[in-house]
C-alpha cells in the first residue's frame, strides 16, 4: 500500500523545500508540482554541487523518479526548456522522466509585459512580484480566456484564441500603461515551435497519478512558495496568485484530498520574507544582519536580499490549521548557532497592547506588534549533525518549545544544505 505525501512551506516561501523533497524522494516513485510557476526557486545541494530548479520537480535528480507538472502550474515553455537544457547538460535524462499536464495555462510574453508594466506603475507600493507573468497568466485562467498547453496542438484554433487574448492585453498596455505592445506573429510562431519541443512530454497527469496510486506506489506532491503567500489565506494583497496550501494539491493535479496520507510543513528555524508586505517579527538590528549573512538569505529566483526575523509561532499555528499538517520539518537550525538569546513570537498585540488573533489582511497585519518569549541560545555547532542526541541541550530545548507552542511534532531537522545533513525522526513514507 503506497503513501501520498504533500510537502509545502508554512511561511513566506524559501523554507528549504527543495532539499527536503530531494531527500525524501528516495522512497517515492513520483513527484508532482501542483501550483505556481517559474517564480519558485528550489535549491538542491548534493555532494557539494548546487542545482537551482524553478519549474521541474526537485525529484528530477533521483534516478527512476517520475516527475510531473500538474494543471495548477502556469507554464512558461521558454523557461521550462531552458531548465531542461541545463539539466541535460549535466547528464540528467529529463525528457524520459518529466510529464506535463495538457491543461497547464501558458505564460505568454504579453503576460510578462503586463506584469512588469503594473509593478512599474505601482511606484513605492509594489507587491514585489518576480515580473515573470505569473499573476496575469492566472488572471486569464480565471477569466476563462487563458490558453493552455494542449491548445498549442490545434494550430488554427490556437492562433484565433491568441489573437483575441493579445488584442485585449495589448490595448491595456498601450492605453493604460503607455507601454509597447507585444508582437502577435512572433508570439504565435515562437509558442508553436516551443510547443513542438515539449510535445513528447505532454500527457494526462491526473491519470498518471491515479494509475500510480492504484499500483500502490508512493507519491509526493511538491508545493512552491509558502502558506503565508496563498492567494486566499496569505497576507493579501502581498501574496502570490495561486493556492500554495494543501488544498491546492487536489485542484492542481486532480488527486482527491482523501487520498493524501501525510502533510509535511517546512519551516525555517527563523523567518524570512522577500519583497513587500507585512512581517511582524522582522529584525533591523545586528541579529537580523547575522541571520541574513549566515543563512545566505538571497532569493534563488530573483537574487533579492531576504528580510529576516525571529521565529513566528503564531503564523505557524495558523499554517498548521490551514494545511492539516501532520508533522514539521525545521530547516536551517545551524544558522542560529552562536546567538546568545533567541526569541520566539508567541502572540500579537495592537498598538494599545491588546491581544490579537492572526490578522491576515495586510493593513491589519502592519499594525501588529510581536510578543516574544526568550530562550537561551547555544555556542556549539549544529552544522551537519545527523542525530538528535548530538544536538546542544539548548537547541533541543528550542525545538521542544516550538513543538509545545504549535502542537505539531518536528519529524525532520535540517542542519545544513546537503541532503545528508539531516535528522529524520519520522519518515513521512514510513
UniProtKB/Swiss-Prot annotation:
Question: What's the cofactor?
Answer: Mg(2+)
Q: What is its EC number?
A: 6.3.4.4
What is the catalytic activity of this protein?
IMP + L-aspartate + GTP = N(6)-(1,2-dicarboxyethyl)-AMP + GDP + phosphate + 2 H(+)
Q: Where is the active site?
A: 14 (proton acceptor), 42 (proton donor)
Per UniProt, where does GTP bind? 13-19, 41-43, 306, 332-334, 414-416
Free-text remark on how the cofactor is bound:
Binds 1 Mg(2+) ion per subunit.
Give the Gene Ontology MF terms in alphabetical order.
adenylosuccinate synthase activity; GTP binding; magnesium ion binding
Has UniProt tagged this entry with the keyword Transcription?
A: no
Name the PANTHER family on file: ADENYLOSUCCINATE SYNTHETASE
Return the similarity comment: Belongs to the adenylosuccinate synthetase family.
Q: Which NCBIfam families match?
A: PRK01117.1, purA
Q: What is this protein called?
A: Adenylosuccinate synthetase
Q: Which organism is it from?
A: Alcanivorax borkumensis (strain ATCC 700651 / DSM 11573 / NCIMB 13689 / SK2)
Amino acid at each position: 500500500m503506497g503513501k501520498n505525501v504533500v510537502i509545502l512551506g508554512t511561511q513566506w516561501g524559501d523554507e528549504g523545500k527543495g532539499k527536503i523533497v530531494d531527500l525524501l524522494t528516495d522512497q517515492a516513485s513520483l513527484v508532482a508540482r501542483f501550483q505556481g510557476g517559474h517564480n519558485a526557486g528550489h535549491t538542491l545541494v548534493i555532494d557539494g554541487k548546487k542545482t537551482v530548479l524553478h519549474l521541474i520537480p526537485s525529484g528530477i535528480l533521483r534516478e527512476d523518479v517520475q516527475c510531473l507538472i500538474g494543471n495548477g502550474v502556469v507554464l512558461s515553455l521558454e523557461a521550462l526548456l531552458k531548465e531542461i537544457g541545463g539539466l541535460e547538460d549535466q547528464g540528467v535524462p529529463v525528457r524520459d522522466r518529466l510529464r506535463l499536464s495538457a491543461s497547464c495555462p501558458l505564460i505568454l510574453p504579453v503576460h510578462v509585459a503586463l506584469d512588469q508594466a503594473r509593478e512599474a506603475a505601482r511606484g513605492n507600493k509594489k507587491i514585489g512580484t518576480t515580473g515573470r507573468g505569473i499573476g496575469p497568466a492566472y488572471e486569464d485562467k480565471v477569466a476563462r480566456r487563458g490558453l493552455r498547453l494542449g491548445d498549442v496542438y490545434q494550430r488554427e484554433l490556437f492562433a484565433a484564441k491568441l489573437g483575441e487574448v493579445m488584442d485585449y492585453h495589448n490595448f491595456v498596455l498601450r492605453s493604460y500603461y503607455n507601454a509597447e505592445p507585444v508582437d502577435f506573429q512572433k508570439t504565435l510562431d515562437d509558442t508553436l515551435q516551443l510547443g513542438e519541443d515539449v510535445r513528447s512530454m505532454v500527457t494526462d497527469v491526473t491519470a498518471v497519478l491515479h494509475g500510480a496510486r492504484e499500483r500502490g506506489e508512493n507519491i509526493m506532491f511538491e508545493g512552491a512558495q509558502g502558506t503565508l503567500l496563498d492567494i486566499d489565506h496569505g497576507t493579501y494583497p502581498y501574496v502570490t496568485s495561486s493556492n500554495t496550501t494543501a488544498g491546492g494539491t487536489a485542484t492542481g493535479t486532480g488527486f482527491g484530498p482523501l487520498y493524501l496520507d501525510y502533510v509535511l510543513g517546512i519551516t525555517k528555524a527563523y523567518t524570512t520574507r522577500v519583497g513587500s508586505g507585512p512581517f511582524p517579527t522582522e529584525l533591523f538590528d545586528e541579529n537580523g544582519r547575522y541571520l541574513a549573512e549566515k543563512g545566505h538569505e538571497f532569493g534563488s529566483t530573483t537574487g533579492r536580499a531576504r528580510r529576516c526575523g525571529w521565529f513566528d509561532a503564531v503564523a505557524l499555528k495558523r499554517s498548521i490549521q490551514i494545511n492539516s499538517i501532520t508533522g514539521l520539518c525545521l530547516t536551517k537550525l545551524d544558522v542560529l548557532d552562536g546567538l546568545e538569546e533567541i526569541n520566539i513570537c508567541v502572540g500579537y498585540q495592537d498598538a494599545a497592547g491588546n491581544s490579537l488573533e492572526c490578522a491576515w489582511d495586510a493593513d491589519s497585519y502592519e499594525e501588529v506588534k510581536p510578543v516574544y518569549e526568550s530562550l537561551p541560545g547555544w555556542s556549539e555547532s549544529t552544522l551537519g549533525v545527523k542525530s538528535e542526541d548530538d544536538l546542544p541541550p539548548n537547541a533541543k530545548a528550542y525545538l521542544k518549545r516550538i513543538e509545545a507552542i504549535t502542537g505539531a511534532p518536528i519529524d525532520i531537522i535540517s542542519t545544513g544544505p546537503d541532503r545528508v545533513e539531516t535528522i529524520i525522526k519520522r519518515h513521512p513514507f514510513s
